Amino acid sequence: MHYLALFFAGAFLCNSLPHLAAGLRGEPFPSPFAKPPGEGDSSPLVNFFWGLFNLLAGGYIVSTHPLVFGINPDFLTVLAGVVFLGGWISVHFGRVRSRKGGK
C-alpha cells in the first residue's frame, strides 16, 4: 500500500503542473470538468483550483509517507508515477490539440 500511495503522489504532483501553469497564465485548458471531460477547455480559474487540489493531494501523500530524494525504492516509485502520468497526458493532450487545429 505504501508504494501505491507514493506512485499516486507522483501522478498527482505531475498532474498539478499543466493545470496550475494554464490557470496562472490565464489560459483555458482541458480538465475533467470540461465537456467532454479531458478534451473541452475549462476556465483558468477551474484549472488553477484543479492544479492546486492535485498539488495538495500529492503533497499530503508525501507528507504521510516521508520521502528521501535519491536512488531508493520510495523515490523511484514517485518518479514512476510522474513518468507514467506525464507520458500518458502528454500523448493525450497532443492528440486533443491536434484535433483542435494544433497551436
Which residues make up each language-model segment?
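Membrane-interface extramembranous regions
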Residues: 1-103
